[in-house]
Curated annotation (Swiss-Prot):
Taxonomic lineage from the root: Eukaryota, Metazoa, Chordata, Craniata, Vertebrata
TM region(s), chain numbering: 13-33, 60-80, 90-110, 225-245
Bilayer topology annotation: Multi-pass membrane protein
Biological source species: Gallus gallus
Protein name (database record): Tetraspanin-12
Lipid sites, type S-palmitoyl cysteine: 9, 12, 83
Length: 305
């Protein structure tokens, strides 16, 4: 009975952990898509520079192929574990444990690679010149992708130009920076800020922001947190799976152990009840003999009187 309760508890815990696997995997896929949007815009602006090379070396080998593949595989493994837990199938649970172990090793290797990989990209003036040279194509109909990338980066990272917002005036024929440089953006805000109050424009350039992007972003922090959480959950799931396998294996190897213990308890209770039943007649007889003796003595005393 105790073993059956333990198995039931282990199964409930594995159900909960598999649900966590699905939720975390979906979250990691969403964060990876979130990072991809940032990476596409950064790569558009930093093409043919050292920054582009650093971005590719830092993010793409781990963030996209490995993490996406691991999360998709983990969703399938969660289904495998769920089926094995429901059916109490030892083979499915063994496959589930082995798959979790392989995924954990891959995640551990990726985590070590990410933290050990230190890309040092010194700021070079040639990179700044390359970034400035692309500013001349801003707003042109055939360079809408570049216009979108500049606007996205300036809004998200709260910067303007490459070194300073005056880069837009130097490198283009514009009389004022784009509206995406405004602290409070609205149509015509940059023109108003240029003529009235320059503090309404972002004062920091986007060049250094791109290098800061390589040092770690909030998206990458969230991704690392989710990766660590998935790893801890996998360790717990593997421990519970081993325990459940042990319980199910010995339950099948000695299926009557609990039944024998239960039978012993029932037999003991029945013997106790039977002993009480056997004692009842003897106690009744003793009581009757005692009563008869007392009545006889009383009758004898009355005759003597």
């Amino acid at each position: 009975m105790a073993r059956e309760d333990s198995v039931r508890c282990l199964r409930c815990l594995l159900y909960a952990l598999n649900l966590l696997f699905w939720l975390m995997s979906i979250s990691v896929l969403g964060v990876s898509a979130w990072i991809r949007d940032y990476l596409n815009n950064v790569l558009t602006l930093t093409a043919e520079t050292r920054v582009e090379e650093a971005v590719i070396l830092t993010y793409f080998p781990v963030v996209h192929p490995v993490m996406i593949a691991v999360c998709c595989f983990l969703i399938l493994v969660g289904m495998l574990g769920y089926c094995g837990t429901v059916k109490r199938n030892l083979l499915l649970l063994v496959w589930y444990f082995g798959s979790l172990l392989v995924i954990f090793c891959v995640e551990l290797a990726c985590g070590v690679w990410t933290y050990e990989q230190e890309i040092t990209v010194p700021v070079q003036w040639s990179d700044m010149i390359t970034l400035k040279a692309r500013m001349t194509n801003y707003g042109l109909p055939r360079y809408q992708w570049l216009t979108h990338a500049w606007n996205f980066f300036q809004r998200e990272f709260k910067c303007c130009g490459v070194v300073y917002f005056t880069d837009w005036l130097e490198m283009t024929e514009m009389d004022w920076p784009p509206d995406s440089c405004c602290v409070r953006e609205f149509p015509g805000c940059s023109k108003q800020a240029h003529h009235e109050d320059l503090s309404d424009l972002y004062q920091e350039g986007c060049g250094k922001k791109m290098y800061t992007f390589l040092r770690g972003t909030k998206q990458l922090q969230v991704l690392r947190f989710l990766g660590i959480s998935i790893g801890v959950t996998q360790i717990l799931a593997m421990i519970l799976t081993i325990t459940l396998l042990w319980a199910l294996y010995y339950d099948r190897r000695d299926p009557g152990a609990d039944q024998i213990m239960s039978l012993k308890n029932d037999t003991s209770q029945q013997l106790s009840c039977h002993s009480v039943e056997l004692l009842k007649p003897s106690l009744t007889g003793i009581f009757e003999h005692t009563s008869m003796a007392n009545s006889f003595n009383t009758h004898f005393e009355m005759e003597e009187l």
